[in-house]
């Protein structure tokens, strides 16, 4: 009954409160879950454990965080890693030489680099497919084991119908893996839509403060959970206790941060659309976005990420060099507003023909909108754009 009551709680509450049993007086009544900064644990007698033996295997602080993330994604298990790429790297251990994966054509550059330069070397084959518009079933082979997508994608904000894709993957008995970093569990839960594994860069919205690195794998399948647990203890890729504490603290404000950032993003996207030096603004919250209706159906919000294309490369470069409060930096999902240049940053290692195919030109900028007062953000953008125009 207690578990049913907990699961019925709204996500804002679940961000702050795990089950009462997990916040019990056993921790001296601490409201903030303690940091167990210990590498190893004493045994009371031979053959008996406290439940923890060595922090590479498990640590109470990490376990608490993992239970929180699992609850937010409605999964049976979540595992915390030292970074998002560490999580994806371990996930690839599910596959063996000769296996084939279908991956979205528009992905984070780090994922593409891993697949092209590490996984392929290990004998895994990939097909790059525009999963939001192509018939994925046409690319499935006898040795296909999984489909890997982001939705929305990084950086072009393409949207894939998760439920429709899950029907295809289940029909062919292959895995559906969804990177949910851009929307976070607050706005979207892929497992509820049929995905088997959810990936997060916890560095982004879950942590939310640009002060630590983390990654997560979440699943609702016991067999996958058991495999991941074996791999994380064997490889030692688990997240350290203090970093777990920082991510846990960040999650407590996930709801208010996501709401505020989205509000700001909508206002900024509208303003950008009106600028004569802006050729295109890509934001899934616009009705003209091809994925708008899908987003309304499968998500609870549109997020705070947007991409815009300037009419000239020089305009893009000048904007990056003239912003002050808004920072020209990689990453996303923090309280600060950041502008990124995918061409030389997040997607620098992506082959040129793929960048061109995805529309990532030297005029494209990606913005992660933060939670500052939107008036201040707009005032800075107005000043910067005026300088860029030479006004």
For the regions a protein language model found, what residue spans apply to each?
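PLP-dependent enzyme catalytic core of the Aspartate aminotransferase-like
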Residues: 2, 116, 125-127, 257, ...
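N-terminal "arm"/small-domain region of PLP-dependent enzymes with the aminotransferase-like
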Residues: 2-59, 65-68
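Conserved PLP-enzyme active-site core in the AAT-like
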Residues: 5-7, 20-24, 78-277, 282, ...
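Glycine-rich beta-alpha junction loops
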Residues: 20-22, 37-43, 182, 204, ...
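Conserved N-terminal alpha-helix of the aminotransferase class I/II PLP-enzyme fold
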Residues: 40-89, 93-94, 110-117
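Short loop segments at secondary-structure junctions
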Residues: 40-41, 219-223, 251, 310-314
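A common structural junction motif
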Residues: 235-236, 323-333, 384-391
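Conserved C-terminal alpha-helix-loop-beta "cap" of PLP-dependent enzymes
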Residues: 280-365, 369
């Amino acid at each position: 009954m207690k578990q049913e009551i907990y699961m019925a709680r709204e996500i804002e509450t679940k961000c702050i409160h795990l089950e009462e049993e997990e916040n019990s007086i056993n921790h001296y009544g601490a409201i903030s879950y303690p940091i167990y900064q210990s590498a190893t644990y004493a045994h009371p007698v031979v053959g008996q454990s406290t439940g923890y033996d060595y922090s590479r295997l498990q640590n109470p602080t990490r376990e608490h965080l993992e239970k929180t993330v699992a609850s937010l994604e409605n999964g049976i298990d979540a595992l915390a890693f030292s970074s998002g790429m560490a999580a994806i790297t371990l996930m690839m251990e599910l596959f063996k030489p000769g296996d084939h994966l279908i991956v979205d054509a528009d992905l984070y550059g780090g994922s593409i680099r891993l697949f092209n330069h590490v996984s392929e070397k290990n004998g895994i084959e990939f097909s790059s497919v525009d999963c939001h518009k192509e018939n994925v079933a046409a690319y499935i082979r006898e040795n296909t084991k999984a489909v890997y997508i982001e939705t929305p994608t990084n950086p072009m904000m393409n949207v894939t119908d998760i439920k429709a894709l899950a029907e295809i993957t289940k029909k062919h008995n292959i895995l559906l893996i969804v990177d949910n970093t851009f929307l976070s569990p607050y706005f979207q839960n892929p497992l509820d839509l049929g995905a088997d594994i959810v990936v997060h860069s916890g560095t982004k919205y879950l942590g939310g403060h640009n002060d630590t690195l983390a990654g997560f794998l979440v699943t609702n399948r016991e067999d996958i959970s058991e495999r991941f647990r074996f791999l994380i203890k064997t490889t030692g890729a688990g997240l350290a206790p203090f970093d777990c504490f920082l991510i846990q603290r960040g999650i407590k404000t996930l709801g208010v941060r996501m709401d505020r950032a989205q509000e700001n993003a909508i206002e900024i996207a509208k303003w950008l659309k009106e600028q004569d030096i802006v050729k295109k603004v890509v934001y899934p919250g616009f009705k003209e976005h091809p994925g708008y209706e899908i987003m309304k159906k499968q998500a609870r919000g549109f997020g705070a990420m947007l991409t815009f294309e300037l009419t000239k490369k020089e305009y893009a470069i000048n904007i990056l060099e003239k912003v002050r409060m808004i920072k020209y930096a990689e990453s996303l999902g923090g309280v600060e507003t950041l502008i990124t240049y995918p061409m030389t940053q997040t997607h620098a290692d992506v082959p040129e023909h793929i960048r061109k195919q995805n529309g990532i030109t030297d005029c494209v900028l990606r913005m992660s909108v933060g939670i500052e007062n939107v008036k201040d953000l707009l005032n800075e953008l107005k000043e910067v754009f005026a300088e860029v125009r030479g006004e």
